[in-house]
Amino acid sequence: MNQEVMNLFNPQVPAQNFDSIRISIASPEKILSWSYGEIKKPETINYRTFKPERDGLFCARIFGPIKDYECLCGKYKRMKYKGIICEKCGVEVTLSRVRRERMGHIELAAPVAHIWFLKSLPSRISTLLDMTLKDVERVLYFENYIVTEPGLTALKEHQLLSEEEYMLAVDEYGEDQFTAMIGAEAIYEMLASMNLEKIAGDLRSELADTTSDLKQKKLMKRLKIVENFMESGNRPEWMIMKVVPVIPPDLRPLVPLDGGRFATSDLNDLYRRVINRNNRLKRLIELRAPGIIIRNEKRMLQESVDALFDNGRRGRVITGANKRPLKSLSDMLKGKQGRFRQNLLGKRVDYSGRSVIVTGPELKLHQCGLPKKMALELFKPFIYARLDAKGYSSTVKQAKKLVEKEKPEVWDILDEVIREHPVLLNRAPTLHRLGIQAFEPTLVEGKAIQLHPLVCTAFNADFDGDQMAVHVPLSLEAQLEARVLMMSTNNILHPANGAPIIVPSQDMVLGLYYLSILNQNEPGEGMAFSDLGELHHALESKVVTLHTKIRGRFKSVDEDGKPYSKIYETTPGRLLIGELLPKNGKVPFDICNQEMTKKNISKMIDTVYRHCGQKDTVIFCDRIMQLGFAHACRAGISFGKDDMVIPATKAKIVADTENLVKEYEQQYNDGLITQGEKYNKVVDAWGKATEKVAEEMMARIKAVEFDENTGRQKPMNSIYMMSHSGARGSPNQMRQLGGMRGLMAKPSGEIIETPIISNFKEGLTVNEYFNSTHGARKGLADTALKTANSGYLTRRLVDVAQDCIVTHVDCGTETGLTMTAIVDAGQVVASLGARILGRTALDDIDHPVTGERIVDAGKMILEPDVIEIEKAGIQSIRIRSALTCEIQTGVCSVCYGRDLARGTPVNMGEAVGVIAAQSIGEPGTQLTMRTFHLGGTATVVDQSFLEASYEGTVQIKNRNVLRNSEGSLVAMGRNMTVQILDERGVERSSQRVAYGSKLHVDEGDKVKRGQRLAEWDPYTRPMMTEVAGTVQFEDLVDGLSVLEATDESTGITKRQVIDWRSTPRGSDLKPAIVIKDASGNVAKLSRGGDARFLLSVDAILSVEPGTKVSQGDVLARSPLESAKTKDITGGLPRVAELFEARRPKDHAIIAEIDGTIRLGRDYKNKRRVIIEPAEDGVEPVEYLIPKGKPFHLQDGDYIEKGDYILDGNPAPHDILAIKGVEALASYLVNEIQEVYRLQGVVINDKHIEVIVRQMLQKVEITDAGDSTYIVGDNVDRIELEDVNDHLIEQGKKPAHGDPVLLGITKASLQTPSFISAASFQETTKVLTEAAIAGKTDGLQGLKENVIVGRLIPAGTGGTMTQIRRIATSRDELILEERRKGTGAAVATPMLQDMAEKAPAAE
C-alpha cells in the first residue's frame, strides 16, 4: 500500500528515447552547471552521530537527504513537506535516491592538467603545442619555466628555462620585457591563445611543401588534432581543469561494518587527498608563502588530481593502507572487472537457477526435465498470481505461506503455470548460439535437470558432472522469441556449416549400426516378406535375425504423393529403420539400405530435413534415437582385451624398418647424406612402418570370419564396430591399442627419432613410456593455455563483426568472387559444389556444351543445381559475396545467400557478423581442448610427388625443361604449371611444379587418373646448371664462407656454406659457383646472363672445383626444415596471425609488375633485385633481399605480377596491394580453412568472408581531389563514398583511395562507435580520442545498444528500429510538404513501407 501511495506522488521518470550519444570535453562552466554545491572539507561522516559532515564529501545539503523525505536535523519528516528546504540544516526534503545522481565540485586554487590528455599516448596537449611530452611535463610539474611571450629579447617562444636561467634572464632583460611562466597556468595560457584556424592553414601549406615521410606523418597527426578541435567545438584550454567534478556519494559509498569500522570506496580517499592539498594551497596563497613552497604544493595538487583520474599513469601508484593500489576513476571503466565488461555487457539475470544435468532419453526433443523444487522457486510470481486468481489466497503473504508449506494445490497450479511456458537452458562456456536453447519444462523428481541426448552435441555437454543454468523468459515477447527462434526443435542445423547438429552419437549410432549390419549365412537367408507385420512376426519367432539377407517389400509414396511399394534386397534391421522414415518421394528407402555409420545417419537426417521439413525431421530424430538406444541395449556390444588384435606381421615390419634405419646410418657414416637428411629419412621410414602395421591391423580386424560348424558369420570385432560406425574411437586410437604407437614429438614439436614400437596391449617399456610422457604432458599444458587463447580470439572476432547485420534485400552489385574447387596435392579437399551451395550466382550459369541455363543470375544455387553444375564439369563460378556487397551498413540478403541454420535465404535483421565470429571461434576452443587426444603422436606429412587427379591431356604453362645426364626431364622454370585438359579442352586441374622436379610427362601426353606427373626430393631443394662446362668456385673461402665439416662418427667431409656476413672480413664476399666453357670463359645462359650461381647459407656443395658437369646436374642442395607435427597448436596462432593481418616472420616478397629480373649491385648484406617492366611507361621496381636467404631466380628470368621473388608466407597486405581484394579474400579464406580442415572441422567460407569484409572497412587516401582529406589519411570506406557523392554533385574532383587491410583488433578499435571500441580494449585511449573529436555514437551495432540498455538492432529489435526510421523519414516528409504549403503530404500506410523492407540500397 505504502509503495503505491509513493508512486502516486513520484511518477516514474519516463525512459528517455534517444538515437545517439555524444562525448566531448567538459568546460569549467559545464561542470559548475552539473554541480549542486562546492565541497570544501575532506571530512566524510561524523563517526559519533554517523551523520554526514556539512560541506564534506557526503554533505546532505549538497547531495540530498539520507532517508526518504526527512531532513538531516529531523525538523521536517513525511511526504507533505516534499520539496521544502530546511532552514536549520539546509537539506531539501525529497527522495534519498537523488544521492545517486547529484554531483558536487571542487574549485581548484590552481589549474591542473587532465592526465588523459597529457599522458594517453600520443599526448594530445604536447602534439597540439608542438612540444615534446617531456618538455610539457617539465613545465607542468614545476621543473622548468617556459617563455610564453619573448618580447624584444633574444629568447625564443616556447623556450624552456631552468630556475637559474630564468633568474639570469630577469637580471639581463628586466622582469617586464618578457613573460615566462611555470605550471599548468603556463600551459593554460598557451592553449587559450592558440588560433586554430591559422595553425590549420599553416599546417596544410607545410604539408604540401614537405617531401620527407616522417615530417609528413608528424604534421598530419597535428593537423588531425587541430581539425578535431575546430569541428567539435571543444576549446584546447578545457584540457586544463580549474574545477574538478565530484561524483554522487552513493556511487562511492561508505558502509559501516560491525565493530565501528567502515568500508569505503577508494575514490573517497583520492578525493580527500585532492581537497586537503587544495585547501592547504589556498591557505598558503592567502598567507603569501614563499614561491617555492607554493610551487611544491601546486605540484602535489596536480599529482593528486592525476591519481584521482588515473592512478599509476604517471609516477608512483598511490596505495591504500594495505599496500593495495587505489582504484581510480579510469580503473572503474577498464578491463574485465570494469564498468563496461562487468556491469554493462555482463549483467547477471534474475529468475535463474543451476543444477547438474542427467540424461533424459524418454523426453521429446523439445522437452527438458526440470526438478520440482527448482520450478517452484523459478515460477514463484506466476504461482502467486494464479493462487490469487483462483481464490486460494487473498494476499501475497498468504500465497507465500501456501508455497512454503508446499500444499497440494500449489503443485497443481505449478503444472498449469509451466504448461507451454518455455525455459532457456545454457551450458558454459557458451561458444556459439546453440549454447543457449529453449525447452518446454516437464516436472521431474530429484534435483537434477534432465537433458535430451540429441542436443548434447550442440551444448557440448556430457553427463560426467556438467552443470547447466536455467532461465525463465518472463514477458510475452520473450516467451514468443524463445518458442519461435530458440526452441531446440528450430536448431536442427549447425550455423557454421549447415549440416545437421541433432545427430545421434555414441550408443545411438552403435545401435543403428548394429541394426543395419548384413551378415552371410544367417538363418532364413533369402526369405521374402510382403509387409512389415510379417517381418516383425518372423523376428519375434526367431525365424530370421536382424542381419539376415532377405527380400522385403517397402511401402512408400512417389514424387506425386501416390503410394507405391517396391521390393528391396535388404535386412530386417534396415527395414526397421526404414519404417521410421517419413513418407516422401524424395526420401527413398535406399538412404537407409546401407551400413548406418554416423556420416550416413547425418546424411539421412539432412535429406529428411531438406525434403520433409522441420516437424517430420524432429519426429524422425526422436524415433531414431529411441530405436538406436533400444538396439544398442539389445546388442550388448562390449569389448575385451582380445578384441585388440596385434597383426602377425608386426615383428617383420619392425625388423625391416630397423634394417632400413641401419642403412641410413651407414649412408650418413659414409657421408652420402647429412645429419638433417638422415633424420628426415629415419622419421619417414618409421612413419611408413607405423602406417603399415596399422593397415595390417585394420585388415585383420575387418576380416569376416565364418564358424566351421554352423557356417554362420562370426560376430564383428567390437572395437572395429565402435570405430567404423563413428560411435567412439578413431583408427588412430585403435592403432595405439593394437598396432604400434609410432613416433612421438618432443615438447618443442620436433619428432623423436626412436619410435614407440609397443602398443598399449603389450605395454610400453620404461624408455618408451618416458618418451611418450613428453607428448602427454605437452597436450595437457597446451589445453590449459589454448583455451584462453581461443576465447580471446572469439572475443576479438565478435567485437570486429558485431555490427554486421543483414539490413537490405539486394544491393544490386555487379562484383563478386570466383569460386573453384580447392585441390591439395592432387586430392580435391573442397569441391566446387560444396563451396557454392546456398550462394547467389553472379552471372547466368549455362551448360558449357548444350548451352542450356542451369541457374539464372541473382538466384540462389540449390542442391539440384549443384548436381547439374558438377555433371556439366564447370570449373569455376562467380558468386555474390558479403565481401563485395555494396550496402553501407551491414550486408544484403542476396550477397550473403542462405542462412545455414535454417536452409532458407537469410532473414532481414539476422546478426550474421556475430554468427560468423562464433562459427570461427567455437571450433578453436574445441580443437585446442582436443590437442591431447593425439597423445603427441606424430603424423609426418611430406609430399614428394604430383599425381594426376583427372584423366586428360597434359599442357605445361611457362615450360622450361632440360634433359639431364640420366636422360630425365628436369623442370628448370620457377613458375611452371602442369595443367590437365579434358577432351573439350577445358582445364580440369592445374598444379605448380617445383624447380628441380623430375617430370614423368611432357606437353601433349595423355594421362590416366592417379598417374605420377612429377616427383622431387621433399627434404632438399637443388640448384642445377642449365649449361655444360667446368665448375669453378668464387668467394668460397674456407672458414669464412664455407666450412669443411668432418663428421666425427664417419670421418667424411662435406662442404657447407656458412654465414659469411658474421665476420668483418667476409662481409664483401659473394659465394658462387661459376661454370666455365671449353675456352675458359664464363659460360652464357640461354637468357643472356652469366652462368654464375649465387649460394645461400646452409647450402651443401655437391661438386668440387674442376668437375665437368652437364645440363641439369645438381651443383648444390639447400636443406628444407625438418618435419614438425601438425596440430592445431600450430593452427590457432596461425588463425590469429591471419585475422590480425600480421606480417609473417620470413614473409615472401611478391613481384608488383610483370618483367625481367636483373640483379643489381649488392649492398653490404642485402641483394638488389630489379624488375625491368615488360610494358613501356612503367617504372622499374627494386627489391632488397637479405643475402643468405635461398634465392632461386637468375639474371634474365621472366617473372609475372604476383609471383614470389622470395619464398615464404606472403604478407596479406602485399596480396591486397598487388593482386587486389579478390585475391586477398581467396588467400585468407583458403589459409584459414586449411587450418580447420586439418582438424576435420567444416566452416562455411561465407563466415570468413564476413570477417574479412570487416577488416577491409578502411581506405587510405592516395589522391585527395577537392576534399579536405590529406594524402595518407585512413578514412572509413562509407564516409569516403558519401564525401565523394557530395563533391561530384558540386562538380568538384572526388578523392581516391586504396583499400587498407586492418587486423581484427585494430579494426575493432577503429569502429565508428566509440562505446563499442571503449568496451573492447584501450578504454582510456579510445575515450580520450573520442572526446577531443566530439564524436557521436549513432548506436548502430549490437554492443553499443546493449551497453545503453536498448534492444539490439538485430532480429526482432531490428524491426522496431526500422519502423522508427521510417516514421522519422515520414515526419520529415510531411513537415517539408507543410513548409512548401502544398497541404498535407499523401502518406501511404506504414505497412507498405514495412513490406518494401528498409529503403533500397543507397
Swiss-Prot record:
Binding note for cofactor: Binds 1 Mg(2+) ion per subunit. Binds 2 Zn(2+) ions per subunit.
Gene Ontology biological process terms, A to Z: DNA-templated transcription
Keywords associated with the record: DNA-directed RNA polymerase, Magnesium, Metal-binding, Nucleotidyltransferase, Transcription, Transferase, Zinc
HAMAP family: RNApol_bact_RpoC
Protein origin, superkingdom: Bacteria
Binding-site list for Zn(2+) 1: 71, 73, 86, 89
Protein name: DNA-directed RNA polymerase subunit beta'
Binding partners and assembly: The RNAP catalytic core consists of 2 alpha, 1 beta, 1 beta' and 1 omega subunit. When a sigma factor is associated with the core the holoenzyme is formed, which can initiate transcription.
Gene Ontology cellular-component annotations: DNA-directed RNA polymerase complex
Binding locations of Mg(2+): 462, 464, 466
InterPro entries membership: DNA-dir_RpoC_beta_prime, DNA-dir_RpoC_beta_prime_bact, RNA_pol_asu, RNA_pol_N, RNA_pol_Rpb1_1, RNA_pol_Rpb1_3, RNA_pol_Rpb1_3_sf, RNA_pol_Rpb1_4
Catalytic activity, reaction form: RNA(n) + a ribonucleoside 5'-triphosphate = RNA(n+1) + diphosphate
Chain's role: DNA-dependent RNA polymerase catalyzes the transcription of DNA into RNA using the four ribonucleoside triphosphates as substrates.
Chain residues that bind Zn(2+) 2: 811, 885, 892, 895
Pfam families: RNA_pol_Rpb1_1, RNA_pol_Rpb1_2, RNA_pol_Rpb1_3, RNA_pol_Rpb1_4, RNA_pol_Rpb1_5
Organism for this UniProt entry: Rhizobium etli (strain CIAT 652)
Record-level Gene Ontology MF annotations: DNA binding; DNA-directed RNA polymerase activity; magnesium ion binding; zinc ion binding
Enzyme class: transferase
E.C. no: 2.7.7.6
Lineage, uppermost ranks: Bacteria, Pseudomonadati, Pseudomonadota, Alphaproteobacteria, Hyphomicrobiales
Cofactors (names): Mg(2+); Zn(2+)
Sequence similarity: Belongs to the RNA polymerase beta' chain family.
